[in-house]
């Protein structure tokens, strides 16, 4: 098993993801520069956080049009798991691999703090280690994290259980106060229709060791590794 971690100009969470995958979860992983056009030999992909290309035009817009993304789309078409974290989520929406868009936070300022999330479904390659309804903790760090989609798209995401994480309070309740950025329906992470692509704004790699304040995020990577082992 080998997982690719995509690097763009401005990516800054790649080494954190590499550390978690290799040293915490114990799987083989390798960083791959955006100019590469071949991901042969990889069984999964992580598009990590950062500020790719300075967030010019829109967050993730330039990165979504780099050569490596054609290979990411091919990996996804093969059913292999693709995980987009923060800026990676933005890249995946810009690449039309995920529905909706990430826009400027409702209160236009950079938000960097811990959030409570509710696991909406455990039936995914990324959440099999969780329980449905479980409340977990992960930090956010973004300026453009407000999830937006048309009403019909939101209804489809709900109907097909493609919403994976929602921002909630400590008791697991969906409230306006628990929503850090104004995301519609408190959405923090979603799947594609085929359920092998996940994008989320919170950072699981920053919550993968107890010394950091939470190790809940580790289960995202462990679930992904289990899925690859069982299917590829």
Swiss-Prot record:
SUPFAM superfamilies, alphabetized: Class I glutamine amidotransferase-like
Domain Glutamine amidotransferase type-1: 2-232
Active site, UniProt feature: 86, 203, 205
Keyword set includes Cytoplasm: yes
Record-level GO cellular component terms: cytoplasm
Catalytic reaction(s) noted: N(2)-formyl-N(1)-(5-phospho-beta-D-ribosyl)glycinamide + L-glutamine + ATP + H2O = 2-formamido-N(1)-(5-O-phospho-beta-D-ribosyl)acetamidine + L-glutamate + ADP + phosphate + H(+); L-glutamine + H2O = L-glutamate + NH4(+)
Keywords linked to the UniProt accession: ATP-binding, Cytoplasm, Glutamine amidotransferase, Hydrolase, Ligase, Nucleotide-binding, Purine biosynthesis
Pathway this chain belongs to: Purine metabolism; IMP biosynthesis via de novo pathway; 5-amino-1-(5-phospho-D-ribosyl)imidazole from N(2)-formyl-N(1)-(5-phospho-D-ribosyl)glycinamide: step 1/2
Single GO biological process annotation from the record: 'de novo' IMP biosynthetic process
Enzyme Commission number(s): 6.3.5.3, 3.5.1.2
PROSITE patterns found in the cross-reference section: GATASE_TYPE_1
Protein localization: Cytoplasm
GO molecular-function terms, A-Z: ATP binding; glutaminase activity; phosphoribosylformylglycinamidine synthase activity
InterPro entries per UniProt: Class_I_gatase-like, PRibForGlyAmidine_synth_PurQ
HAMAP family: PurQ (MF_00421)
Description of how the protein assembles with itself and partners: Part of the FGAM synthase complex composed of 1 PurL, 1 PurQ and 2 PurS subunits.
Function statement: Part of the phosphoribosylformylglycinamidine synthase complex involved in the purines biosynthetic pathway. Catalyzes the ATP-dependent conversion of formylglycinamide ribonucleotide (FGAR) and glutamine to yield formylglycinamidine ribonucleotide (FGAM) and glutamate. The FGAM synthase complex is composed of three subunits. PurQ produces an ammonia molecule by converting glutamine to glutamate. PurL transfers the ammonia molecule to FGAR to form FGAM in an ATP-dependent manner.
Stated name of the protein: Phosphoribosylformylglycinamidine synthase subunit PurQ
Organism expressing this protein natively: Methanosarcina acetivorans (strain ATCC 35395 / DSM 2834 / JCM 12185 / C2A)
Gene that encodes it: purQ
């Amino acid at each position: 098993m080998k997982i690719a971690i995509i690097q763009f100009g401005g990516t800054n969470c790649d080494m954190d993801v590499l550390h978690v995958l290799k040293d915490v979860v114990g799987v083989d992983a390798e960083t791959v520069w955006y100019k590469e056009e071949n991901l042969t030999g990889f069984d999964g992909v992580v598009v990590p956080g950062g500020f790719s290309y300075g967030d010019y035009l829109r967050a993730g817009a330039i990165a979504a049009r780099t050569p490596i993304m054609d290979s990411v789309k091919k990996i996804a078409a093969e059913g292999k798991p693709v995980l987009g974290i923060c800026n990676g989520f933005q890249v995946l929406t810009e690449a039309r691999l995920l529905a909706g868009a990430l826009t400027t936070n409702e209160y236009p300022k950079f938000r960097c703090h811990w959030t409570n999330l509710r696991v909406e479904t455990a039936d995914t390659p990324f959440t099999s280690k969780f329980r449905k309804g479980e409340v977990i903790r992960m930090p956010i760090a973004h300026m453009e994290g407000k999830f937006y989609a048309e009403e019909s798209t939101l209804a489809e995401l709900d109907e097909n259980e493609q919403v994976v994480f929602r921002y909630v309070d400590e008791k697991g309740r969906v409230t306006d106060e628990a929503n850090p950025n104004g995301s519609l329906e408190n959405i923090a992470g979603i799947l594609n229709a085929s359920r092998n692509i996940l994008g989320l704004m919170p950072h699981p790699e920053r919550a993968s060791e107890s010394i950091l304040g939470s190790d809940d995020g580790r289960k995202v990577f462990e679930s992904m590794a289990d899925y690859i082992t069982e299917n590829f």
